[in-house]
């Protein structure tokens, strides 16, 4: 049996593509464009895993398909290379994070090239390259000029032992840091913020203009969290102080019996009475030790302290005690709520715990037993009595505005983006703070502001980043002699990934972020493929920056990514014992088709789980490429199932894909190729061209491969293979298995040219229709012959053909034919005597 040698074929064609710049982006203005984008990876020390190539293979198939269809294709790759792991490694080993990052990138690039992806490497970007982050910094200066980047004192998660603030995501549920397990305290610190809230409505509205999965759009809508309601102002009794509450249910104001402020609310100290001061101070201290997540947990016991003061309910003049409680966050809404315990579960639990009034204002339910949270007509509500929800809200807003104690208000759950990190390995923020109290952005002519190389990258311990220790970089003097200090915080990893898709369009431009004409030519991105875990943050931040750049006239489109596709996760093979605990693969043995624990002998159940080092079920693509070849890996990952499904890795499936490619190789290299078309494969060939073309376009790669298999099976039944069909088939399989595609194309054509730009095959609609039909001939009700005849033969012609058949003639010899019943396209029934 003939098998192809992937170890010879694959490196040969990879070298050919590199030497000939086969995938250089086309610039012929008369052609349509296609921009296929992968979410670029963080180049970790671990290298690629088999999950990465799934999305990369999908965009690569589309890119190869569109090139063959005559498009200019932009298909680039780069590196999201700033980030904590490199910094941590550098701190642990004393090495420069830049060196570690460069080594990782080289390894990733080697692995990616071994998989045969058609990237235009002339457009490679690296977020840690000063020539790249010059423009990240330039965007920041534009945000600063527009008032969209500002400094604010905000509560952060401070870890004294690490000497830095950490993100909410890095705080464990027990209130300690993910790294090191140290105590985390909430502490106000000067931070850079980006005013993403200024774009909330547009970020919401423009989701209608993009072709994204509805689930991702919903996640963004929920994150933005638009609410329509009213602001209500409450005066504090016997003071000149007041506070504002936002509520989506101003119609329930008659049922508001107490108010709650966040412990951090600016008014707390001013309105706390002397006899409550100690309890309030103690409670504030306790609250600062909890994360926002822990504070707002619905299941937790309600805690709070009375300030000693009362607010006046503006609609009925009643006194409402003012409490502080940690379930109200200073960063959400106004940091104050009016509590309507009869109709809100959390307020009801709080009121029951602290013996506060509960007054029902909606009909229905028994508020002594539980909060009534459904809709009902208004009661105990003065001028709102008898009204439904919508009418009552409108009437109350009208009253609030007429009385000057409130107004209609739209709010968003979205918070401004905390943009600074007390870290070394990130883009320096291009701002100088002068001793006269002013701050200015570094002028464009002095960008990039290069990250200084330093061995001392441990946190400074002062709340500033390690850059505070690099005094010769830090301290500057203006021409007029005024001294200043550079901003020491760096940007988060999100910064470089918020605009990288723009730089691919014009990666070597030293004068501007990218040329306007080129941006006009290539935007928006036609297909963006990546994991659903980036649904909110990365995609929201990129959309925000894009809209700012649109307002500045830099980009010509409102949205960056026209179509988004989330590939599923490739799960590892894992095993569970009877308790449901996962067992590492090196502790499992297979006997007679079942799996057993090596140490206990217990029979185990096979179950898919996320690949992890601890389960020892991570599959390295290098091993797969070595054993089976890159084309096999590509075909297998596309054939596993729908691209958006999460599916378990299977060695058997991999072997099946390799066997299929061997059959393809044998078909083209050992079957006699002829210039004469017998017509036997007309239908299946044209069906295959049609199906593969449509299914690749719809990203249904698994069904496209299934149709290629149908063709191979049909072609193997024939003695010869028509040359045009052989070539067309090789073109169809080439985007999936590009190395094999190139090899077989040369075997058929000896052209010396890559298959990449050979026009995509077309199909003949007329050949999709069956021209022949099989009919049965029955004698005395028994089938005696089956005939293939032209479709739609008349009764007379059908009868003639049937009676002329040798088998039929042998059956009727010497017999009397009483009648012949012919049913076109179905059967002939002969009645004899």
UniProtKB/Swiss-Prot annotation:
Keywords: Aminoacyl-tRNA synthetase, ATP-binding, Cytoplasm, Ligase, Nucleotide-binding, Protein biosynthesis. One of its GO terms (molecular function) is ATP binding. One of its GO terms (cellular component) is cytosol. CDD domains: Anticodon_Ia_Leu_BEm (cd07958), LeuRS_core (cd00812). Its main location: cytoplasm. It catalyses: tRNA(Leu) + L-leucine + ATP = L-leucyl-tRNA(Leu) + AMP + diphosphate. Its EC number is 6.1.1.4. A motif ('KMSKS' region) lies at residues 610-614. A motif ('HIGH' region) lies at residues 41-52. Gene3D superfamilies: HUPs, Isoleucyl-tRNA Synthetase, Domain 1, Valyl/Leucyl/Isoleucyl-tRNA synthetase, editing domain. GO terms for biological process: leucyl-tRNA aminoacylation. SUPFAM superfamilies: Anticodon-binding domain of a subclass of class I aminoacyl-tRNA synthetases (SSF47323), Nucleotidylyl transferase (SSF52374), ValRS/IleRS/LeuRS editing domain (SSF50677). It is an enzyme of class 6 (ligase). It comes from the Bacteria. PANTHER family: LEUCINE--TRNA LIGASE, MITOCHONDRIAL, LEUCYL-TRNA SYNTHETASE. This is Leucine--tRNA ligase. It comes from Streptococcus pyogenes serotype M2 (strain MGAS10270). The gene is leuS.
């Amino acid at each position: 049996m003939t098998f192809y040698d992937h170890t010879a074929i694959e490196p040969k064609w990879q070298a050919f593509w590199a030497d000939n710049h086969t995938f250089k982006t086309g610039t012929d203005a008369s052609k349509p464009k296609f921009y296929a984008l992968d979410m670029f990876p963080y180049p970790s020390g671990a290298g690629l895993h088999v999950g990465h190539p799934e999305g990369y293979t999908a965009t690569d198939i589309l890119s190869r398909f569109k090139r063959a269809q005559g498009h200019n294709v932009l298909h680039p790759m780069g590196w999201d290379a700033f980030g904590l792991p490199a910094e941590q490694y550098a701190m642990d080993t004393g090495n420069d994070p830049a060196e570690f990052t460069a080594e990782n990138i080289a390894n990733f690039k080697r692995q990616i090239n071994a998989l045969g992806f058609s990237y235009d490497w002339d457009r490679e970007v690296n977020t840690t390259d000063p020539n790249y982050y010059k423009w990240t910094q330039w965007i920041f200066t534009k945000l600063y000029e527009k008032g969209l980047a500002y400094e604010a004192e905000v509560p952060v998660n401070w870890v004294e032992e690490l000497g830095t603030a950490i993100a909410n995501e890095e705080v464990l549920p027990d209130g300690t840091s993910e790294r090191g397990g140290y105590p985390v305290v909430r502490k106000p610190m000067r931070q850079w913020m980006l005013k993403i809230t200024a774009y909330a409505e547009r970020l919401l509205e423009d989701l209608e203009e993009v072709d994204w999965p509805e689930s991702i759009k919903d996640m963004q809508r929920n994150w933005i969290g638009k609410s329509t309601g009213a602001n209500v102002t409450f005066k504090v009794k016997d003071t000149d102080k007041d506070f504002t509450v936002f509520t989506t249910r101003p119609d329930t104001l008659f049922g508001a019996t107490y108010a709650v402020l966040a412990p951090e609310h600016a008014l707390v100290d001013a309105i706390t009475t002397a006899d409550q001061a100690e309890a309030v101070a103690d409670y504030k201290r306790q609250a600062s030790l909890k994360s926002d997540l822990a504070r707002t947990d619905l299941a937790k016991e309600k805690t709070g302290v009375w300030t000693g003061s009362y607010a006046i309910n503006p609609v009925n003049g009643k006194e409402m005690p003012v409490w502080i409680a940690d379930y109200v966050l200073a960063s959400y809404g106004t940091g104050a709520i009016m509590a309507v315990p009869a109709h809100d579960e959390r307020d009801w639990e709080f009121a029951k715990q602290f013996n506060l009034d509960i007054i029902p204002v909606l009909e229905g339910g028994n508020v002594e037993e539980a909060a009534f949270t459904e809709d009902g007509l208004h009661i105990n509500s003065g001028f709102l009595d008898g009204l439904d929800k919508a009418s009552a809200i409108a009437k109350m807003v009208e009253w609030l505005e007429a009385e000057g104690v409130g107004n209609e208000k739209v709010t968003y759950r979205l918070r401004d983006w905390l943009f600074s990190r007390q870290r070394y390995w990130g883009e320096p923020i291009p701002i100088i703070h002068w001793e006269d109290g002013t701050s200015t952005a570094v002028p464009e002519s002095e960008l990039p502001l290069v990250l200084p190389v330093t061995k001392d990258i441990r946190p400074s311990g002062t709340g500033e980043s390690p850059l505070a220790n690099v005094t010769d970089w830090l301290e500057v003097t203006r021409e007029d002699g005024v001294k200043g200090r550079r901003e020491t915080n760096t940007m988060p990893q999100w910064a470089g990934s918020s605009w990288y898709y723009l730089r691919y369009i014009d990666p070597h431009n030293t004068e501007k972020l990218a040329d306007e004409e080129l941006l006009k030519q290539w935007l928006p991105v036609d297909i963006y493929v990546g994991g659903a875990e980036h649904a909110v943050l990365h995609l929201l931040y990129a959309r925000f920056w894009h809209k700012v750049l649109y307002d500045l006239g830099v980009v010509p489109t409102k949205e960056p990514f026209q179509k988004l596709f989330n590939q599923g996760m490739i799960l590892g093979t894992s095993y569970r014992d009877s308790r449901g605990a996962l067992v590492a693969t090196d502790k499992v043995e297979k006997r007679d088709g079942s799996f057993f624990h090596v140490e206990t002998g217990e029979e185990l159940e096979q179950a898919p789980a996320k690949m992890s080092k601890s389960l020892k079920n991570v599959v390295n693509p290098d091993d797969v490429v070595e054993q089976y070849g890159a084309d096999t890996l590509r075909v297998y990952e596309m054939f596993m199932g729908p691209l958006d499904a999460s599916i378990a890795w299977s060695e058997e499936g991999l072997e099946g894909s390799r066997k299929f490619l061997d059959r393809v190789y044998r078909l083209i290299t050992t079957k006699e190729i002829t210039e004469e078309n017998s017509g036997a494969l007309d239908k299946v060939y044209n069906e295959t061209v049609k199906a593969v073309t449509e299914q690749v376009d719809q990203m249904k790669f698994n069904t496209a491969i299934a149709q290629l298999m149908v063709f191979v099976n049909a072609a193997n039944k024939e003695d010869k293979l028509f040359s045009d069909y052989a070539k067309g088939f090789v073109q169809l399989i080439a985007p999936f298995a590009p190395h094999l595609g190139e090899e077989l194309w040369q075997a058929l054509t000896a052209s010396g040219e890559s298959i990449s730009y050979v026009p995509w095959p077309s199909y003949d609609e007329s050949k999709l229709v069956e021209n022949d039909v099989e009919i049965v001939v029955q004698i005395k009700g028994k089938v005696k012959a089956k005939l293939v005849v032209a479709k739609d033969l008349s009764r007379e012609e059908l009868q003639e053909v049937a009676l002329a058949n040798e088998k039929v003639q042998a059956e009727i010899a010497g017999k009397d034919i009483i009648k012949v019943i012919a049913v076109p396209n179905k059967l002939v029934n002969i009645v004899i005597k």
